[in-house]
A protein has these predicted regions:
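Catalytic cores and adjacent flexible loops of soluble metabolic enzymes
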Residues: 1-187
Length: 187
């Protein structure tokens, strides 16, 4: 997949979209949890993403109790923003009916398996989960394309993640996970 001049020449199919060398830029509208758990807002964000020309929308799929303990300071916020699996499936269908690709970041094995059951075309792995070997193994075993963020990852951790993921169709995202971004952190 590497050309002699050092350019990557691999293309990955995200359902009906090709991503990779010589393909148009693939624009993802990050909805995440910005819907605040409100289906009406989530649907509005899908429509706005479509209107803006985005190729896809991305959500976060999780079970709050598996992410943080109940006494954690962000538990209530995450719980409020959590969308049930049933409603997440409705959002995927809503996006499909509006001709925009949807996918998600699973934060636990159950969420990954649910996303697989609704034919999620690609899995996005958050930077902090690059070291979550159980999640990486689960997602890799599902044989779908993976987008792996590397913002909080050193080279050794990245190599370990790549060994676990194996030969899956993979897109690496280099990002800096500090906000605001100071010039000395930009590379």
């Amino acid at each position: 997949d590497i050309l002699e001049n050092g350019q990557i020449n691999k293309k990955i199919n995200f359902k009906n979209k090709k991503v990779g060398f010589s393909e148009p830029t693939f624009v993802i509208a990050e909805i995440g949890i910005n819907h605040n758990g409100d289906m009406k807002i989530a649907k509005e964000l899908i429509l706005k993403a479509k209107e803006s020309g985005a190729d896809a929308v991305k959500f976060q799929t999780y079970i709050t109790e598996k992410r943080v303990p109940k006494n954690h300071e962000v538990f209530d916020i995450l719980k409020k923003c959590e969308i049930s699996f049933e409603n997440q499936e409705k959002l995927f269908k809503y996006a499909e009916n509006n001709d925009i690709l949807s996918f998600s970041t699973p934060f636990d094995k159950e969420s990954a398996l649910f996303l697989n059951s609704i034919d999620c075309p690609v899995f996005k792995i958050a930077s902090f989960d690059t070291v979550n070997h159980n999640l990486l193994s689960c997602v890799s075993d599902l044989k779908r394309p993976i987008i792996l963020s590397t913002g909080m990852t050193n080279i050794s951790e990245l190599n370990d993640a790549l060994k676990i993921i194996g030969s899956a169709d993979l897109a690496l995202l280099h990002c800096v996970s500090s906000y605001p971004l100071y010039n000395f952190n930009a590379d």
